Amino acid sequence: MSFNFLKDNNKKVHFIGIGGISMSGLAEILLNSGYRVSGSDRSESDLTKHLQAKGAEIYIGHNGNNLKDVDLVVYTAAIPDSNPELVKARECNIQTMDRAEFLGHVMQGHKYNIAISGTHGKTTTTSMFSHISLSANLDPTILVGGNLDVINGNVRVGNSEYFVTEACEYKASFLKFYPYIGVILNIEADHLDFYKDINDIQNTFLKFAKLIPNDGFLIVNADDKRCVEVSKQVDCNVITFGINNGDVRAKNIVFNNGRPTFDVYRNEEKLFTLTLNVPGNHNILDALASISSALSLNVPVDSIIEGLSTFNGAHRRFEIKGKVDGITVVDDYAHHPTEIKAALNAAKNFPHKRVFCVFQPHTYSRTISLFDDFANSFSNADTLVLADIYAAREKDTGVVSSTMLGDKIRENGVNCKNLHSFEDIVTFLKGELKDGDLLITIGAGDVYRVGEMFLEAK
């Protein structure tokens, strides 16, 4: 199926799992381009309601009868072959395509595809670059893995040759993309339910980098040795960034109330001084990646400064949820040991008396494969509360639990408590937190509800 938006928008596309953050964005891109769209999901959500209001046919629950006059069925990697809609589509010889391949087709309609990859920081960097591209009036189409205030959601449909998207390495999805600019923020062990080991992961990132045409750009973190190794094996232009190394660097970094100010240098030339509204060294690196990408497109420095100066953070990325009785409540999507350390480092740089952390591990496979790394991630928390593991797509086989992780963390000298329900966690926090303390909820599941419940309870 060819996706020439000017010629083929009489087609009807059905999305299985249309309520997901990426699938809903793709559906909205098609709706804005005049396609007929239908889709199903297990439950109603704000995203499904939004799409319905834009004209999509939404079905709650998966049923083969939901496929009505459909030309193409798009599904996510999480959808099993036994899904009744996928079964029906194949029985009826309706073309099917997974989300990544479909996104690749959409990207082919644009000349300048900016695909942002890495184990951590994809959503924040995509959001930062989106701010820059809007300030520069590039009129981009944007697809981001979280809600971004400046576009009032997770998708923006532009009318230019610029397409900005996250590029996820899970199940090697990003190998179906067509990047003109490919960003690799970092390469670490994750998704070990799919990859054999870290070398397998690095080789997959190399394959992604080799998708970039010779006149395109690979933007890589010079402070990450695996990124550097990848950059030495490509034929396209390479721009490196970093705090300690790189073509584009941050120097003279100072923190004020958690917010970093630094000078941006390209080689030995000072370009400008920048203050970010988001805390932590990891956000400096994400900003440098965005700046490097913008410089490769010859975006004016003034637009770069304006874009990053108006960026106040992506949702669920060190997001300040509120303040009550002098207690600041923050939420962060971190679900990998490196991300957790970065979030807690940002918390330490934020004005506080004590840092209370509530962590909900995400998936059994990730918890067991990175068990020791998780256990060593919480030294910057004065008190840690562990919630039960968020299963997501997995089943509990009894191999690992939050209690087991808590025992290991306590061996490392961290004040750690295991509690099983959010209600019990909130009750504990109400009795412990005092004026000047900072509460940070961490995890990719629904642990953000703890912060919301605490604010409501107070």
Swiss-Prot record:
ATP binds at residues 118-124. Keywords: ATP-binding, Cell cycle, Cell division, Cell shape, Cell wall biogenesis/degradation, Cytoplasm, Ligase, Nucleotide-binding, Peptidoglycan synthesis. One of its GO terms (cellular component) is cytoplasm. GO terms for biological process: cell division; cell wall organization; peptidoglycan biosynthetic process; regulation of cell shape. Its main location: cytoplasm. It comes from the Bacteria. It catalyses: UDP-N-acetyl-alpha-D-muramate + L-alanine + ATP = UDP-N-acetyl-alpha-D-muramoyl-L-alanine + ADP + phosphate + H(+). Pathway: Cell wall biogenesis; peptidoglycan biosynthesis. One of its GO terms (molecular function) is UDP-N-acetylmuramate-L-alanine ligase activity. The keyword Amino-acid biosynthesis does not apply. It is an enzyme of class 6 (ligase). It is found in: Cytoplasm. Its EC number is 6.3.2.8. HAMAP family: MurC. Cell wall formation. Belongs to the MurCDEF family. This is UDP-N-acetylmuramate--L-alanine ligase. It comes from Clostridium novyi (strain NT).
